[in-house]
A protein has these predicted regions:
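Conserved catalytic alpha/beta core of Sir2/sirtuin-type deacylases, generalized to analogous enzyme cores
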Residues: 1-186
Length: 186
C-alpha cells in the first residue's frame, strides 16, 4: 500500500495561517492581471501574506506526514511541509525571498497567480496516476473550489485508490489516520 497526500489551506489553518477563503480582500488581488497593473499594491499584498506566514510553525499534521515519509502534493505557499521535513510538490510555488519583494509583481511561481501557468500541475497528475487500487489518496484540508483539487480526486478515483478526506482538525487527525493505516512508528 502506498499513501499519497494532497493538502490545502486546511492543514495550515491550525498553524495560524488564514485561508484565502477567509481573506477575500487578499484573494481578489492574486491575479496576474492585477499584479501587472497595480505593482505597488500587489507587492504590499505579498508582503502582508509573507508577514502572516513568517513565524508560522508546522503543526502535527505536517510533522506526521514527514515522519511517515508520505509524499505530499500541496496547494499551499507557506512552506510548512518543507519545514517539517517533507519533500512536497508545491503546486502554487512559494513566496518571494526578502530581496525580491520590490519586484514581486513580476515574478512567476512566487506564488502562482490566477491566470499564470502552473508548472507543477503535470507532475501532480503523474503522481496521482501512479496510484493503484490498494493505495490511499489522503486529502487534507482541500476544498472543491479549484480545478486541480477536483481533478486529482477524480484521477485517484479512476485509478481505484481509496480516498480518505480529512477536513477538520487536521493537526490531530492526520497522525491518527496514518497510525490506523500504517501503525504506530514508535
Amino acid at each position: 500500500m502506498k499513501i499519497l497526500a494532497f493538502t490545502g489551506a486546511g492543514i495550515s489553518k491550525q498553524s495560524n495561517i488564514p485561508t484565502f477563503m477567509e481573506r477575500p480582500d487578499v484573494r481578489e488581488k492574486l491575479f496576474r492581471s492585477y499584479a501587472n497593473v497595480h505593482h505597488e499594491e500587489y507587492n504590499e499584498v505579498i508582503k502582508q501574506l509573507k508577514a502572516n506566514m513568517n513565524g508560522a510553525k508546522p503543526n502535527d499534521g505536517h510533522i506526521a506526514l514527514a515522519e511517515y515519509n508520505i509524499p505530499v502534493i500541496t496547494m499551499n505557499i507557506d512552506g510548512l511541509h518543507k519545514l517539517a521535513g517533507s519533500e512536497a510538490l508545491e503546486l502554487h510555488g512559494g513566496l518571494p525571498e526578502d530581496d525580491e519583494m520590490d519586484i514581486a509583481y513580476s515574478l512567476y511561481n512566487k506564488p502562482v497567480l490566477y491566470g499564470d501557468p502552473a508548472p507543477n500541475y503535470q507532475k501532480a497528475y503523474e503522481m496521482v496516476y501512479t496510484l493503484q487500487p490498494e493505495d490511499v489518496f489522503l486529502v487534507v484540508g482541500c476544498s472543491f473550489h479549484t480545478g486541480i483539487s477536483v481533478d486529482l480526486r477524480e484521477i485517484a478515483k479512476s485509478r481505484g485508490a481509496r480516498i480518505i478526506e480529512i477536513q477538520e482538525d487536521a493537526a490531530h487527525n492526520v497522525r491518527k489516520t496514518l497510525e490506523e493505516l500504517i501503525g504506530d512508528m514508535k
